[in-house]
Amino acid sequence: MPNPPEYEHLKNQVRILSLNGGGARGLFTISLLAEIERIIEEKQGINGFKVGDYFDLITGTSIGGILALGLAYGKSARELEDVFRKQAGYIFPEQKYPRFFPVFRRRYRLARGPLYDSKPLAKTIASMVGEESTFNDLKCRVLIPTVNLSTGKPQFFKTPHNPEFHRDGRIKLIDAALATSAAPTYFAPHYCVDLDSYFADGGLVANNPSFIGLHEVFRDMATDFPEAKVSDVKILNVGTLGEEYSLSPSSLAGKSGYLGLWGMGERLVLSAMAANQELHKAMLLREFATHDAIGNFVRLDNNIPHEAASDITLDNASASSLSNLASRGRQLATEEFTKNKALADFFKVPARKFK
């Protein structure tokens, strides 16, 4: 089918929205996207604008994967922001530790099981995409990384955008969402009945899924974009205020044994996620630089000020932390949309439908 006139100059261009993992910090991500919707509606005098309509592929990990599925399902970023902000406190309830020995109390809890029950998370996901919806119901191509604990391999849930795909179309969205967000120590592994497998958080392999999104264009999206080159791919990557995680030299030198250094595994998980996030970003930038297309990668994120770092954590869903996250997301959206033409260019023409 020939391209409509407004798409002719974009026939080889591929736009990807990539959403990082980060637990409760995902409110920063979705608040930023929601503010972009508000800005564009105000500037253009329109109603019902949805950021998800402007991308050929949406990829996301952990909370980013949940949000990616919601956007591809047809929800606006503002709808998802409203749901997540209301439910975050139920997903990550405040831990009622005694005044004394809180660290030991937390470790005792972890020794018996994960920190949080997955049921409130499942309920939140269901309110976003339904309990029975499948990948066949999505309006945009999607790529969701997870770790299949039963096979010991990474696994990527996808829409059936490759004619050879026969598996994921029937998979329920809620299963993929729970799989990609099952962060070790925080949530139990997710069991998917349809695949008879257990899954863990996709952040263990690709907390920033931008590079695997680029790879997807030339592998399983090649039927739809047979002439696309690396220089034709544009990626908007939204972070979660959590680019770096490191242990202090004094901690590394002074701690001995697993418990002393890693606690009950939380610091190990966060270190692994932060390191692979930096690795994927570095590989992506190198690939774009090789093709003289470094400007095709637009990254929206902020470093957390030192004094705020202890408050803005993966599982802090206190009212003050959520307000901080939402405010930072809205502020960055306003600043970048005003001065960054490359950001505004993502939203000039809606993406072509893949079905």
From Swiss-Prot:
What taxonomic lineage is listed for the species of origin? Bacteria, Pseudomonadati, Pseudomonadota, Gammaproteobacteria, Vibrionales
Q: Which UniProt keywords apply?
A: Antiviral defense, Hydrolase, Lipid degradation, Lipid metabolism
* Pfam families per UniProt: Patatin
Domain (PNPLA): give its ranges: 17-214
One Gene Ontology BP term is:
lipid catabolic process
One of the entry's Gene Ontology molecular-function terms is: phospholipase A1 activity
Q: Which organism is it from?
A: Vibrio cholerae serotype O1 (strain ATCC 39315 / El Tor Inaba N16961)
Q: Which Gene3D superfamilies match?
A: Cytosolic phospholipase A2 catalytic domain (3.40.1090.10)
Report the active site residues.
S62, D201
Free-text disruption phenotype from the record: Deletion of capV suppresses cGAMP-dependent growth phenotypes resulting from overexpression of dncV.
Q: Where would one find coiled-coil regions in this protein?
A: none
User: Does the keyword section mention Lipid metabolism?
Assistant: yes
**Top-level class of the enzyme under EC nomenclature:** hydrolase
Entry protein name: cGAMP-activated phospholipase
Q: Which reaction does it catalyse?
A: a 1,2-diacyl-sn-glycero-3-phosphocholine + H2O = a 2-acyl-sn-glycero-3-phosphocholine + a fatty acid + H(+); 1,2-di-(9Z-octadecenoyl)-sn-glycero-3-phosphoethanolamine + 2 H2O = sn-glycero-3-phosphoethanolamine + 2 (9Z)-octadecenoate + 2 H(+)
